[in-house]
Amino acid sequence: MLRLPKKGLPRFEQVQDEDTYLENLAIQRNASAFFEKYDRSEIQELLTTALVSWLSAKEDVRSQVDLPCGIMSQMNNVGFSTAILLTPVDPTALLDYREVHQMIRELAIGIYCLNQIPSISLEANYDQSSSCQLPPAYYDTRIGQILINIDYMLKALWHGIYMPKEKRARFSELWRAIMDIDPDGKPQTNKDIFSEFSSAGLTDITKDPDFNEIYDEDVNEDPTYDPNSPEETAVFMKYAENIMLKLTFSTTQIQQYENVFIFETGYWLTNAIKYNQDYLDICTYQRLQQRLYLQKKIIQKHFEKKKDIRRGIGYLKLICFLIPFLLSLKKKMKVPYLSSLLQPFSDDKVKTERELPPFIYGRDFKCQNFHYKENQYFHVHGGIEFDISTPSIENALEDFQKNLEKIRDCAANTFIEDSGYKEYYSIPVMEFHGKSYYVIYFELETFYQQLYKTQWWGAINEIVNNLRLKRLPLTDAQLHEQFKKKLGFKRAMKCKSIPFGMKSAVERGLSAVFHTFSRKTSSSTINVSDEAGYTIFHHAALHNRVSIICQLCNANFKVNQRRFVTFSQGPTPLHLAAQACSLETTVCLLCSKADYTLSEKRGWMPIHFAAFYDNVCIIIALCRKDPSLLEAEATAENQCTPLLLAATSGALDTIQYLFSIGANWRKTDIKGNNIIHLSVLTFHTEVLKYIIKLNIPELPVWKTLVEMLQCESYKRRMMAVMSLEVICLANDQYWRCILDAGTIPALINLLKSSKIKLQCKTVGLLSNISTHKSAVHALVEAGGIPSLINLLVCDEPEVHSRCAVILYDIAQCENKDVIAKYNGIPSLINLLNLNIENVLVNVMNCIRVLCIGNENNQRAVREHKGLPYLIRFLSSDSDVLKAVSSAAIAEVGRDNKEIQDAIAMEGAIPPLVALFKGKQISVQMKGAMAVESLASHNALIQKAFLEKSLTKYLLKLLKAFQIDVKEQGAVALWALAGQTLKQQKYMAEQIGYSFIINMLLSPSAKMQYVGGEAVIALSKDSRMHQNQICEGNGIAPLVRLLRISTIAEGTLLSVIRAVGSICIGVAHTSNPVSQQLVVDENAFPVLIQLLRNHPSPNIKVEVAFSLACIVLGNDVLQKDLHENEGFEYADVLYLLHSTEKDICLRAGYALTLFAFNNRFQQYLILESGIMTISIFERFLESTVETEKAMAAFQIVVLAKVIRDMDHITLSARGVTILVDSLYSVQTSTIVLTGNLIASLAHSRAGIPEAFTTLGTIQRLCYHLYSGIEEVRAACSSALGYLTYNANAFRILLKECRNKPNQFIRIKNNISRDASINPAFLKEFQMQQTLVGLPSLSLEKNGGPSIIPIFKRGKEHRRKLKPKIQPKDSLTLLPPVTNFMGLFKATKKTKDSHNIFSFSSTITSDITNVSRPRIVCLNQLGKHVQKANPEPAEG
């Protein structure tokens, strides 16, 4: 009933008009609707928080609190009616103006009416769901949605699990029924739990393309730490329930000019561990922190990948400023004019989730941060907070002040043109100083009750006051219901005990429950300490329960109350808040006049806790309160500043922030330790790397580390070495800094220490930098070699392994003899007695490198009995040891026939062959390397390998996919081909045309070379093979290689020779088929270009010779070469005057081929330049018989071209020299002479007669009895061609009649392509048939002597029968040389026998040295047998 006043009815002017009445009614209706979204428990939380908040405006002096620093205490002049905010733009995620206005509206209601600022905390429920604990004012708001979405994505990245918002909202309602959750929160279902979650939409977050491989990246730069080791995982999971990741936002800059505010905000990703020091000691904390740091790095790197997240972060940054800004306006009685804002979102658009369903891991989920049992689901925890303190307001920059009117116009005109509904409302943007800023505008009105009019805040306050009387305090039933909902039935029953219930309410953040309990009990009961000495106040600070702290402050509890056990120097609530990153609590306590200068037992103030526990936002709040705290020293222990404590704990974020605000990094603790010393002593290498990047001359990290290496303290030396070991691996250039700092001599001194762990770490560090030549030189100069060799005799295999690696690196830098001088080789060989694989690998690799190109070291390995060890490892059970020993044997025996024979004598060949019967291709590759080395220029070893059918195994390597395996197989095969043409031809036939052509097409220089050599071997004196190569399209690959400009010179030489060899046959006969095919492949232009332009004279002269082979005896091609290709003999003639004898002689040979049996070409040569006998004289007088014979051949053919001597005289001299050469004792001379005589025997008239006159026939017949097949073949060919001369015909027929076996020898040894007079064959057969041959016993007819000089019987022939039978007979010289190499005097050389040297460097494979990045001290003395070097039984 409406009661009228006694003065009667009101006057008309006092009555509200109808419009005002309707407006008030709408306001009251909206206010009532605002509260309809809450259920009873939420209303109770809302009312309690609004009632007790320290942000509520009270006039009671006793309840006054300090204002937060910054804008709330500085803003004075608020005479403006509009506010304009400028904040930087993120162009990749633009904000929406309507969203901004929505948030301003929600903040106005939350701050002005309900005294609540936004935040979120995800709290665990008893059934493993997670409550989205927002301040109740922000339920069902856009701000609440953004907070939940951002925090959920943070937790999703932390756990690697995600469920889309729509699906998780639906699943949140159903999952308990699906799982059949009992009152204790346990699932009773028999269903596959993960399948249910998966079908509901839960997935591995890496399925999202934006996060596809984020957990595959290794962000751990400390090799000493394995975050996924069982020990670290177990420790982490022990404390995981109370570890949380949270985002903290803080305003970093504010500028003001009149009503324009320019601000910037930042955020930090912080981890908080809600344990006090009784449950979590500092050492364990640092272990957890190290793992969390790696997890944070991944999240920070990928968190803002999605546009929605970047936009959400942008809104949260804006909210971070709006909170203190609106609080400041509230203090100045100003409020946003909500009616001027854009239309709000409907209620169904801003619904917030009250809880989140649990997470669960699938078997194949990639994230390894947490380890739960299979099918175990779990809750998530974390939060987002805003710092309501701000930096001091600065005056706006001049650019902003000058453009004030433009800013105001831009802000005011935003919605004038189009105020209708739009999907997206853009915020105007302006540029200042090259940076874009949003221009956000809203109107203000006065914040007080107006006459006759009800304001929106008045209506809400009225409802709050009415509800408070109805809803508070809670009944016992409501208390039980609240506890049961959050904690489960069993624990809810325990909460009937007030102390237990109050503590549970504090830990869970149940403000209304705590308010009710506090009404039921006395202050003394509330303030009682638990068994650890902590009060409710401490627990509230630790768990960041601001509303409960407000209740305690309102009840006049001591804000500086200490933990008390046996002494009163325990931490205050502010200490615990600083430790646990309770940002809101810290600001609340500071404003409640908590003493931030109090120290606990270690002398730490809250600022020290914040620095040590890496809580940047707490440091910001404390330093804004009192900037002097930045350099505050702890009052006990080492008197550390916050910066020094941060270095002690490795709090990198804190260190970076403290440096940015000017903390004094020169300060030291009481022991003189600065930030570098403390980082080293506590092994925080991330901090050291950061300081290195700062590059502050007064903070010399490298110099400091060297000083620590040189000090007396074992700990300081050890920690310095350990830090250097890690740092040198962090950056590819840090090794140089270590070197330049003079670290090497200090490290060498440490090697002389008696501390085995220090020695281990030192050699570990040295092995990480010894891969660089300059570091090796410094090591040698500092006397490191004898120190390292001395360590080889210690008892620790880890030291052996590392020292061997370093010596391996040193040996690669020309220090092989120095290592040998200090008895390095016997020391290394002694280690081969060990049975530890990584040691054996490194030792054998070191021995291998020491022997590369060093005959003395090769002999030393044999002399010190190292060969049996290496050979024994060929039969090891370990593939690695087999491969490494093979590689070592290859270098020990390379180019040293004496050692090769010794290795064979020790029994290396059978186990080497056995390697190829295994399946490991890498082992076979190294075995092939050993085969190549041992067989090179060693006929006996080649024979031994061939007798064991090694060829078929090596051929399998040619089928491998890897190019390096193919080329090693090819090189090994060619090493087995030996130096005789017969053996090479046999090997080429075994390889086959297909493989040879594939080699020529290969990109490998080695393969191309072997392919070229195989073509030479096959085509040499064999028209059949030449034609088959042509038919198999083998010429095109050869010509293609000629066109490659980058081809290796050795390979190019081989290919050029192959092209020539394929066109020339026995006794300088030609093959018109192959000649024409070579020309058809356009080889002429390529060869002419090489002849004229290639820088190497070797290439030029070989091209000239090949051109001569291509046109030999082919007038059409000779004409084509001269007329169409522009070939001139002058291009070859000038090579005759080369200072190199080989080139000069080879050029003469090329011209000889051009002139051979061709008078016209001789004329062209004569016209092209002057050729005198002096060119050949040095060869004709040479002591090298092959040079002399070749020059003699040339002057005979070129007799009419040489101008200064009669051609008859020249021919006679040449023939005489060749005949005399047949009396040589050198095989190569006889073979060459026989072939040259065969060629001259079918040249011009008179030459065969001259040979016959000089007794050539008899001498050639004598050589038919030689034991060397090449000699017999060459002489047989010469005799065959001489039979076309009548006189020679008669003499040879007589020889064959008197010695019946003579004809058989000629027939058996003559080359298939060589020619013999058919008339001679017919005549001999006729005389054999009709006349008969004399008895073999007639000595007077040339028969055998009674006392035989030579064994010529059947038995001898059987022994001479070669095991290698190529398809056609072999003659002449090794095709690799093509006569050229025979013209040098025989001399011993230390160089490789390979004419074309290829690098023998081992590719990256299983034979690499074992170089672990870090020495694990906890593994010293523990060695597991990894390999059995003894052959397996059976």
UniProtKB/Swiss-Prot annotation:
> Where in the cell is the protein located?
Membrane
Q: Which domain of life is it from?
A: Eukaryota
What transmembrane ranges does the database entry give?
309-329
Alphabetized SMART domains for the sequence: ANK, ARM
Give the ANK repeat ranges. Answer: 532-561, 569-598, 602-631, 638-667, 671-701
The topology of this chain with respect to the membrane is: Single-pass membrane protein
Q: Does the keyword Metal-binding apply?
A: no
User: Can you list the GO cellular component terms from the UniProt entry?
Assistant: membrane
Q: In which tissues is it expressed?
A: Ubiquitously expressed with highest level in pancreas and lowest in skeletal muscle.
Cite a single Pfam family from the UniProt record: Ank_2
What are the alphabetically sorted keywords of the record?
ANK repeat, Membrane, Repeat, Transmembrane, Transmembrane helix
Q: Which SUPFAM superfamilies does this chain map to?
A: Ankyrin repeat, ARM repeat
ARM repeat coordinates:
732-771, 773-812, 814-852, 855-894, 897-936, 1072-1112
What protein name applies here?
Ankyrin and armadillo repeat-containing protein
* Species of origin: Homo sapiens (Human)
